[in-house]
UniProtKB/Swiss-Prot annotation:
Coiled coil listed as a keyword: no
Cellular component, GO annotation: beta-galactosidase complex
Temperature-activity profile: Optimum temperature is 30 degrees Celsius with o-nitrophenyl-beta-D-galactopyranoside (ONPG) as substrate. Has high specific activity at low temperatures.
Protein name: Beta-galactosidase
The protein's Enzyme Commission number: 3.2.1.23
Induction statement: By growth on lactose.
Effect of pH on activity: Optimum pH is 7.2.
Gene3D superfamilies on file: 2.70.98.10, Galactose-binding domain-like, Glycosidases, Immunoglobulins
Species per Swiss-Prot/TrEMBL record: Arthrobacter sp. (strain B7)
Membrane-traversing stretches: none
Superkingdom field: Bacteria
Enzyme category, top tier: hydrolase
Keywords: Glycosidase, Hydrolase, Magnesium, Manganese
Length: 1015
């Protein structure tokens, strides 16, 4: 029997049923989910290289026979991925981003082609074979990657398109009573060339399998298109035999009942009093469409999507997408859908001000879109298509422009649109992702435009706008994004000539991927949001991406960790590039997500002082639809981090609730600032009442204002002249040996030693995009210049292996001066460090002057010092920015106040260990020992008013940099306190722009002034 179907470039074959909506029908159905008999073969039977893969005497398709003995097979759950079952018994996952994990030789695949044979029996009721049944269909919602189906030994057909539904007509093969279903699934096929998305390759039947009895007089398909322009319209499309009529449409809440006696009677229905649907007010109406034989239930949302000039409008109002790219991924189940988890995913998005989702890069499980309708999101629904691996071949042979693949690509788009066309949340169709360009993509767009006039078509790779409706880019720099928004810019856009560039500037612009969220970062999110505020053409974007794709794994000794590329011994892989989410694999929100939440909040707050010294609060409602009646403003006043007053305000103005698009200014009660220290006024916008996605009091945004009076200059001890005699070995709570600290507040310590190194972040390791260095990023549209990663530059400069040479240890009056010089082997550059220790009462003053030599041609990761402490130092409280880590280009969500946490809570458990835990703008930090206060360090601003930051860790930055996973960090007998005069920014160069020059740390002289005493 031929196996040519594996390399067939078509969309599938056999008794395939035309694509239709995923409908909630009362027609009889039978779920075939559950335990199936399963075996895994190393290659596909019947292929030239298969050899003796089958047992002696077993023919290629004997597995389909009812007499075949599968009693020795294993049992495997459906839905599932076989590579995630039985601890690797059936192979392991493979992660690639762009690379194909097989030779690029389309449409062929390797002989090593894992093939899973599935068998199960099931009973079909006798009633399904009565005259009231028109057809029996078998539906697969997701199988990776190509599969052949048999029922009772009869070949039914071949399915393709891993994340797309496929139905087969099995009417002739089924019988009353016991039946046998056999499915042969191949991991690799011609279809794999179309599914090169940045994710794990996870074969198997991973979505639902269902048998359906289609009734005589049933409704084959229903599409209720809705519009809203002050009143509502339903434009129905009913696919059914004439004998199915009359057909009735009911919307009980609207008192609507319309009966169509024949297909010719089906016509639009106008509704005067109807509330519109939006992502903020996801108003849905229960509806049904019924014939005598079948009733279909739907939930209708009335909205109109329209592009007017360069504006993308829903219900006549501009949409700003504060979105995320969302893969279907779970640490335990892979792409197997779980409704409770999906609902919590969406609720978490809402809590963090995410209002939009791009379904990267395929349709999700259909129930996910029901939830998006219900909770309220703008959705770009993307087709299951990516051919990114052909980029390495300069797109030669790319299926997007090869006529042999045309039917498969258009079929994929048809099944995408037809399945999900009833969803109010879907406001755009997307042809796919990173598949170059070509005639087949244009054909997909043409089919979509002809089929659905109510939604625009998106595809980022259509740089010139030849066949799509919006201008979309990924990872454009700040200068380039600025030029896209400007009406007076004549700069050529990517892939465009002057005429094409001008045309693209007449369209709505979205960033379909931006602020790549890999590891610690992204930085400078606010720069993009500022441009969205500034230029009407810009409509926001979609963060890459929502969730890390780690797979929960255990070491031989049972230690749990989240695996990424290479952890399963893949031949080729792309490492931890799959760990690039705003939430970690265990759903923990990252500091980057908190930063994003604050920056994109639609309730924007700003505090100012008027001429009389009273605080004014400006509240801007940047929502699409909703007024702010659901928002309460809570203010508080804190003196030196301690709350002294608090109250509430409403967002109502003279004309009632603050409407979408409006702003108002409120005057707060008179606040008396403390004569000494710091007084901070903070205001939070919180939910008045609980919603489907958050409790009452959930914060939406926050702002602060420093009300502190000018403080007298701090009398900082200046370096004194040395005096005769030996340097002291004891100064208050500290003892020294040869100028080095050896005990502090009764505990052994070491340091302080200069630290310029940080464990490189994923962005520090990125080099796919240019570096800014000393160049002005506006000169070349922000592309930067080709350069090694910052991490490589730092290592080449030896910043991770500085050695110390003590030049001088001298006694001071009541103090000690230590002069040292730090440099790396084979480096001509150094850093001079002078420590001045002086005892004043029970306080030990420490002034550290750090001065790099001339000639450093790089940015520094940090400028600071490290203190090695005993391991019983296990936490900290502080007055400064918090409670989460913060960096120069990621400070918007940091609130000045008193914060605290254990050592573990102070750091983020990123999938690949890296720099974490820096807390900015510190006034004081109090370290705990075994949970009790031990040491207090007060940090004073330098001459320019700049305050230091701190971090507390169990491992040195050098140890962290060497560990592939958290569990591979060495056991430590210490805790390490880093006191940083400055830190380098984060950027997003893992896949995006470098650190913006304003936040880059140039080699420069810095000073730390600290006051230390026992707590």
């Amino acid at each position: 029997m031929s196996s040519s179907y594996i390399t067939d470039q078509g969309p599938g074959s056999g008794l395939r049923v035309p694509a239709r909506s995923w409908l909630n029908s009362d027609a009889p159905s039978l779920s075939l989910n559950g335990d199936w008999r399963f075996r895994l073969l190393p290659t596909a039977p019947g292929t030239p290289g298969a050899g003796s893969v089958l047992a002696t005497g077993e023919t290629v398709e004997a597995v389909a026979s009812e007499s075949f003995d599968d009693s020795s097979w294993d049992t495997l759950a459906v839905p599932s991925h076989w590579v995630l079952a039985e601890d690797g018994k059936y192979g392991r996952p493979i992660y690639t981003n762009v690379q194909y994990p097989f030779p690029i030789d389309p449409p062929f695949v390797p002989d090593a082609n894992p093939t899973g044979d599935y068998r199960r029996t099931f009973d079909v009721p006798d009633s399904w074979f009565e005259s009231t049944t028109a057809a029996l269909t078998l539906r697969f919602d997701g199988v990776e990657s190509r599969y052949k189906v048999w029922v009772n030994g009869v070949e039914i057909g071949v399915g393709s398109g891993s994340r797309l539904a496929q139905e087969f007509d099995v009417s002739e093969a089924l019988r009353p009573g016991k039946n046998l279903l056999v499915v042969r699934v191949h991991q690799w096929s011609a279809a794999s060339y179309l599914e090169d998305q940045d994710q794990w390759w996870l074969p198997g039947i991973f979505r639902d399998v269902k048998l359906q009895a289609r009734p005589v007089g049933g409704l084959t398909d229903v599409w209720l298109r809705t519009d809203w322009s002050g009143s509502g319209t339903i434009t129905p499309e009913i696919t059914a035999d004439p004998a199915a009529f009359p057909v009735t449409l009911r919307v009980p809440e609207l008192g609507l009942e319309v009966i169509w006696d024949s297909p010719a009677d089906v016509a639009p229905v106008s509704i005067d009093a109807v509330e519109p649907w939006s992502a903020e007010v996801p108003r849905l109406y229960d509806a049904s469409v019924s014939s005598a034989a079948e009733s279909i239930s739907l939930r209708l949302g009335f909205r109109t999507v329209k592009i007017v000039g360069d504006q993308f409008l829903v219900n006549g109002r501009k949409v700003i997408f504060h979105g995320v790219n969302r893969h279907e991924t779970n640490a335990d189940r892979g792409r197997v859908f779980d409704e409770a988890s999906a609902r919590e995913d969406l609720a978490l998005m809402k809590r963090f001000n995410v209002n939009a989702i791009r379904t990267s890069h395929y349709p999700p499980h259909p129930r996910f879109l029901d939830l998006a309708d219900e909770l309220g999101f703008w959705v770009i629904l993307e087709c299951d298509l990516e051919t990114h691996g052909f980029h390495a071949l300069k797109w030669v042979g790319n299926p997007s422009d090869d006529p042999a693949w045309r039917d498969a690509l258009v079929d994929r788009m048809e099944r995408t649109v037809e399945r999900d066309k009833n969803h109010a949340s879907i406001v755009m169709w997307s042809l796919g992702n990173e598949s170059g360009t070509g005639a087949n993509l244009a054909a997909m767009a043409a089919w979509t435009h002809a089929r659905d006039l109510s939604r625009p078509v998106h595809y980022e790779g259509d740089y010139t706008g030849a066949y799509t409706d919006v201008y979309s880019r990924m990872y454009s720099s700040i200068p380039e994004t600025d030029s896209i928004g400007r009406n007076d810019s004549h700069a050529l856009l990517l892939g465009c000539n002057a005429i094409e560039s001008a045309r693209q500037r007449t369209r709505p612009f979205i960033l379909c991927e931006y602020v790549h969220a890999m590891g610690n970062g992204p930085g400078a999110i606010d720069q993009y949001e500022d441009l969205v505020d500034k230029y009407p053409r810009l409509h926001g974007g979609f963060v890459w991406e929502w969730r890390d794709h780690g797979i929960r794994t255990r070491t031989a000794d049972g230690t749990e960790f989240f695996a990424y590329g290479g952890d399963f011994d893949e031949v080729i892989h792309d490492g931890n590039f799959v760990m690039d989410g705003m939430i970690l694999s265990d759903s923990t929100p990252t500091p980057g997500l908190f930063e994003y939440k604050q920056i994109v909040s639609p309730i924007r707050l700003a505090l100012t002082l008027n001429a009389e010294g009273n605080a004014g609060l400006t509240v801007a409602n940047l929502r699409h639809t909703s007024d702010a009646s659901d928002v309460v403003l809570r203010w508080r006043v804190e003196h030196n981090g301690t709350r002294v007053d608090a109250g509430e305000l409403t967002t109502d103005g003279a004309n009632g609730p603050l409407q979408a698009g409006d702003s108002l200014t409120l005057t707060l009660p008179t606040i008396v600032a403390a004569a000494e220290g710091e007084t901070w006024l903070s205001v939070e916008a919180v939910l008045r009442e609980a919603t489907a996605w958050a409790p009452a009091g959930h914060p939406l945004s926050e702002t602060q204002l420093d009300l502190s009076p000018a403080q007298p200059p701090l009398r900082v001890p200046r370096p004194a002249s040395p005096i005769a005699g030996a340097a002291p070995v004891e100064l208050g709570p500290a003892t020294f040996d040869a100028g080095s600290l050896v005990t502090l507040a009764g505990l052994p310590v070491a340091g302080p030693r200069l630290e310029l190194w940080r464990a490189p972040t994923d962005n520090d390791k990125g080099q796919g995009f240019g570096a800014y260095g000393p160049e002005d990023p506006w000169i070349n549209s922000g592309r930067g210049v080709p350069a090694p990663s910052s991490a490589v530059v730092w290592q080449q400069a030896g910043l991770d292996r500085l050695t110390r040479r003590v030049e001088d240890v001298a006694a001071l009056p009541q103090g000690l001066r230590v002069r040292s010089r730090y440099a790396a082997a084979n480096s001509e550059h150094d850093v001079a460090v002078e420590e001045n220790w002086q005892l004043s009462g029970d306080e030990l003053w420490l002034r550290i002057d750090i001065a790099p030599s001339a000639g450093w041609d790089l940015v520094f990761p940090r400028i600071g010092v490290r203190l090695d402490l005993p391991s019983e130092v296990d936490g900290a409280s502080w007055f400064g920015a918090g409670p989460r880590e913060s960096y120069p280009d990621s400070l918007h969500s940091a609130v000045v106040g008193t914060h605290g946490g254990s050592l573990e809570e102070l750091n983020v458990n990123y999938a690949r260990p890296q720099e974490t835990g820096h807390h900015s703008d510190v006034r004081w930090v109090e370290l705990s020992r075994d949970g009790a206060p031990w040491l207090r360090i007060e940090a004073d601003p330098d001459a320019l008013g700049r305050r230091p930051g701190f971090s507390l860790a169990k491992n040195t930055a050098q140890e962290v940099a060497l560990a592939p996973h958290p569990h591979e960090l060495p056991e430590s007998q210490h805790s390490y306190l880093y006191l940083d005069a400055a830190q380098h920014g984060l950027g997003s160069r893992a896949c995006g722009p470098d650190v913006w020059p304003d936040f880059a740390l140039r080699p420069e002289a810095r000073t730390l002034v600290l006051r230390i005493r026992a707590a």
